[in-house]
Protein backbone atom coordinates (compact mmCIF):
# COMPACT_ATOMS: atom_id res chain seq x y z
CA UNK A 1 0.00 0.00 0.00
CA UNK A 2 0.99 3.64 -0.33
CA UNK A 3 1.22 4.06 3.45
CA UNK A 4 3.63 1.14 3.74
CA UNK A 5 5.75 2.49 0.87
CA UNK A 6 5.84 5.89 2.61
CA UNK A 7 7.00 4.27 5.85
CA UNK A 8 9.76 2.34 4.05
CA UNK A 9 10.94 5.49 2.25
CA UNK A 10 10.93 7.48 5.51
CA UNK A 11 12.90 4.70 7.22
CA UNK A 12 15.45 4.56 4.40
CA UNK A 13 15.79 8.35 4.46
CA UNK A 14 16.39 8.31 8.22
CA UNK A 15 18.95 5.52 7.78
CA UNK A 16 20.85 7.63 5.26
CA UNK A 17 20.80 10.63 7.60
CA UNK A 18 22.24 8.52 10.41
CA UNK A 19 24.87 7.04 8.09
CA UNK A 20 25.77 10.51 6.85
CA UNK A 21 26.17 11.74 10.44
CA UNK A 22 28.30 8.74 11.41
CA UNK A 23 30.53 9.21 8.36
CA UNK A 24 30.81 12.91 9.17
CA UNK A 25 31.89 12.14 12.74
CA UNK A 26 34.41 9.56 11.53
CA UNK A 27 35.75 12.17 9.12
CA UNK A 28 36.29 14.62 12.00
CA UNK A 29 38.16 11.98 14.00
CA UNK A 30 40.30 11.10 10.96
CA UNK A 31 41.16 14.78 10.50
CA UNK A 32 42.14 15.08 14.19
CA UNK A 33 44.41 12.06 13.82
CA UNK A 34 45.90 13.44 10.59
CA UNK A 35 46.54 16.82 12.26
CA UNK A 36 48.15 15.02 15.19
CA UNK A 37 50.41 13.04 12.87
CA UNK A 38 51.41 16.25 11.04
CA UNK A 39 52.27 17.88 14.37
CA UNK A 40 54.22 14.79 15.40
CA UNK A 41 56.32 14.87 12.23
CA UNK A 42 57.09 18.57 12.82
CA UNK A 43 58.24 17.62 16.30
CA UNK A 44 55.56 19.46 18.28
CA UNK A 45 54.73 16.64 20.64
CA UNK A 46 52.40 18.67 22.90
CA UNK A 47 49.81 19.11 20.12
CA UNK A 48 49.83 15.37 19.46
CA UNK A 49 49.29 14.60 23.15
CA UNK A 50 46.41 17.11 23.36
CA UNK A 51 44.73 15.69 20.23
CA UNK A 52 45.18 12.04 21.24
CA UNK A 53 43.86 12.43 24.81
CA UNK A 54 40.12 12.40 24.17
Swiss-Prot record:
Spans annotated as Plays an important role in the hemolytic activity: 3-12
GO terms classed as biological process: cytolysis in another organism; monoatomic cation transport; pore complex assembly
Molecular-function annotations in GO: channel activity; toxin activity
Gene3D superfamilies (alphabetical): Cytolysin/lectin (2.60.270.20)
Key words, A-Z: Cytolysis, Ion transport, Membrane, Nematocyst, Secreted, Target cell membrane, Target membrane, Toxin, Transmembrane, Transport
TM stretches of this protein: none
Region (N-terminal region): 11-30
Cellular component GO terms, alphabetical: extracellular region; nematocyst; other organism cell membrane; pore complex
Pfam family membership, one: Anemone_cytotox
Function of the molecule: Pore-forming protein that forms cations-selective hydrophilic pores of around 1 nm and causes cytolysis. Pore formation is a multi-step process that involves specific recognition of membrane sphingomyelin (but neither cholesterol nor phosphatidylcholine) using aromatic rich region and adjacent phosphocholine (POC) binding site, firm binding to the membrane (mainly driven by hydrophobic interactions) accompanied by the transfer of the N-terminal region to the lipid-water interface and finally pore formation after oligomerization of monomers.
Additional notes on this entry: A synonymy between H.magnifica and R.crispa is controversial.
Self-association and partners: Octamer or nonamer in membranes. Monomer in the soluble state.
Protein name per the record: Hemolytic toxin
Taxonomic source organism: Heteractis magnifica (Magnificent sea anemone)
Lineage: Eukaryota, Metazoa, Cnidaria, Anthozoa, Hexacorallia
Amino acid sequence: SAALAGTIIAGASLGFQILDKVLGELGKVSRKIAIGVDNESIGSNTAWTXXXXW
